[in-house]
Amino acid sequence: MKNRVISLLMASLLLVLSVIVAPFYKAEAATVVNTPFVAVFSNFDSSQWEKADWANGSVFNCVWKPSQVTFSNGKMILTLDREYGGSYPYKSGEYRTKSFFGYGYYEVRMKAAKNVGIVSSFFTYTGPSDNNPWDEIDIEFLGKDTTKVQFNWYKNGVGGNEYLHNLGFDASQDFHTYGFEWRPDYIDFYVDGKKVYRGTRNIPVTPGKIMMNLWPGIGVDEWLGRYDGRTPLQAEYEYVKYYPNGVPQDNPTPTPTIAPSTPTNPNLPLKGDVNGDGHVNSSDYSLFKRYLLRVIDRFPVGDQSVADVNRDGRIDSTDLTMLKRYLIRAIPSL
């Protein structure tokens, strides 16, 4: 956990942010989202998101560079690597929304990076650079032990709410869902659809931006362990969701495959059922990716048109994106 030393370092970070980051953050007028928001990371959506291009300083021993935020096979990837000829020895990625989000349920599906001395994160943040107090809610993976996740939050720059939760699995080995429901008098944290912790003191109140980053620490060895300089390292993200009215149907999106769908008319071909088993599920999604990567040149199903999910007469990445949105319940049907 962070100790008094960490708190002091983070306080100094707040001052640095107010000076260095202000021009970057103020590029967009503040907009608070009060409707459901779903982002599937098939590509860079510059209308909703920004790639950071600056440095925090303090405990963050890297510069954020847009080149370190990439998209591949339906994932957003943050890459920590060496930086040559700059003010920092390392470069990495940070991705964040242009808009602000308040009370509600937040969820991410991600795979953390594993290595001593680093942090993979999903969080909300606002601060002096937004003309706001420093309010923040964190889900953080300390790379030295990715069988645990750390929850924390700040209200007006005051933290000290760290809680380490034993996951029962290694977060760097596979994708899982993590979330939190933020309310005026509590924050509930979730792992794979199960509520695992509730915080009730010093709850933040100011809407913030949804953010993700990967970074190596410096001067915080007691917390993170001493970073050994290993590169490249990657944290991967599949989607982000926000529901202002709280946990949808009192149950966050679980990691296991969504129950297969069955056509109402069995005589009609089922859109998205590219393996021809009568259902649309993650097996079809995996097969579709293999097709687009040209690992296979034809789907097992007889009617190849079932792959034209968006019905535009072509079979391409837009169909895969639509299929993925259906599987994570971002859209009700195909």
UniProtKB/Swiss-Prot annotation:
Entry's EC annotation: 3.2.1.73
Keyword Transmembrane included in the entry's annotation: no
Keywords, ordered alphabetically: Glycosidase, Hydrolase, Signal
Record-annotated active site: E136, E140
Subunit structure: May form part of a multienzyme complex (cellulosome).
Protein family per UniProt: Belongs to the glycosyl hydrolase 16 family.
Top-level lineage group: Bacteria
InterPro entries reported in the protein's UniProt record: Beta-glucanase/XTH, Beta_glucanase, ConA-like_dom_sf, Dockerin_1_rpt, Dockerin_dom, Dockerin_dom_sf, EF_Hand_1_Ca_BS, GH16
Record's protein name: Beta-glucanase
Repressor recorded as keyword: no
Organism: Acetivibrio thermocellus (strain ATCC 27405 / DSM 1237 / JCM 9322 / NBRC 103400 / NCIMB 10682 / NRRL B-4536 / VPI 7372)
Domain GH16 residues, every copy: 28-248
UniProt xrefs under NCBIfam families: BGlucanaseBglS
Catalysed conversion reaction: Hydrolysis of (1->4)-beta-D-glucosidic linkages in beta-D-glucans containing (1->3)- and (1->4)-bonds
Gene Ontology molecular-function annotations: licheninase activity
EC class of the enzyme, as a word: hydrolase
SUPFAM superfamilies in UniProt: Concanavalin A-like lectins/glucanases (SSF49899), Type I dockerin domain (SSF63446)
Signal peptide extent: 1-27
Annotated ranges, domain Dockerin: 267-334
An annotated GO BP: polysaccharide catabolic process
